[in-house]
């Protein structure tokens, strides 16, 4: 394998002028081993990118830049849940459509999030009361330090609110994600934007979530942006009850019993939208 010089201006959400001198597409573990050998010989670090929808690209990448082309879907319909392995290069919303068409449930609240499947576990993407970690069984990775493939279980991924082990470990390249999905429609509708709706199937939920998102955040293809990248602040119920001004804000119950406040609404009220 040989690198190519590549212009990346149209490969990031902000459409920033950017280029890489050493760029590789990869589709297999063997590809990654060859790329790693090249990087070591050139004394270069390795930087992985996805669709660039949640990143600020530099004008010039001096290190080796890689991107997955693994668009594979592997389905195993056994047991109470359906196991689905998805390649890192699959566009997230294409996965949502795949699940709707196959009658696989659980990810509907996460519809409309830009990016790829490989990026989803990194910050444990979430929206409208749901997180991807609730459906992850394992993540297949390539370890740049050992030059070997490794499988991390859900617990080994150390998922938290918008965080995971992948934010701490630069040596792990996500190759594919193993999901465990529901066989019946059990929507989470406790978020204010959804609680007044009634849905008969996942397709209706997905369409509604996409419509809500489109009203709030423009498509990066139409207006360059990084989407919703901030965290909603979380406080205890006791703190929430003590401050009556907080009751004027949108709030949601967290799974651990705390109260989550809407950072987006706070920014709107401060005139920082």
Language model region names:
Residues 1-135, 143-145:
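Anion-binding (especially nucleotide phosphate/pyrophosphate-binding) glycine-rich loop
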Residues 4, 8-16, 55, 149-273:
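Phosphate/pyrophosphate- and phosphate-bearing ligand-binding catalytic cores of soluble enzymes
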């Amino acid at each position: 394998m040989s690198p190519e010089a590549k212009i990346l201006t149209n490969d990031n959400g902000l459409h920033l002028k950017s280029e890489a001198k050493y760029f590789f597409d990869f589709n297999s573990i063997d590809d990654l081993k060859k790329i790693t050998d090249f990087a070591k010989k050139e004394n270069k670090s390795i930087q992985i990118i996805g669709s660039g929808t949640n990143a600020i690209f530099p004008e010039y990448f001096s290190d080796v830049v890689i991107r997955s082309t693994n668009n594979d879907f592997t389905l195993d319909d056994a047991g109470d849940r359906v196991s689905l392995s998805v390649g890192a290069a699959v566009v997230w919303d294409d996965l949502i459509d795949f699940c709707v068409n196959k009658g696989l449930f659980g990810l509907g609240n996460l519809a409309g999030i830009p990016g790829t499947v490989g990026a989803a576990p990194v910050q444990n993407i979430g929206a409208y009361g749901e997180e991807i970690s609730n459906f992850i069984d394992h993540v297949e990775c390539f370890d740049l330090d050992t030059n070997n493939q490794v499988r991390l279980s859900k617990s080994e991924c150390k998922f938290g609110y918008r965080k995971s082990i992948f934010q701490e470990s630069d040596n792990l390249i996500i190759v594919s994600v193993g999901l465990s999905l529901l066989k019946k429609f059990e929507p989470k509708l406790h978020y204010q934007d959804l609680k007044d709706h009634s849905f008969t199937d996942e397709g209706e939920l997905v369409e509604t979530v996409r419509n809500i998102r489109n009203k709030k955040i423009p498509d990066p293809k139409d207006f360059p942006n990084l989407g919703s990248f901030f965290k909603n602040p979380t406080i205890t119920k006791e703190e929430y009850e003590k401050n009556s001004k907080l009751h004027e804000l949108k709030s949601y119950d967290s799974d651990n019993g705390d109260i989550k406040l809407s950072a987006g609404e706070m920014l709107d009220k401060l005139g920082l939208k």
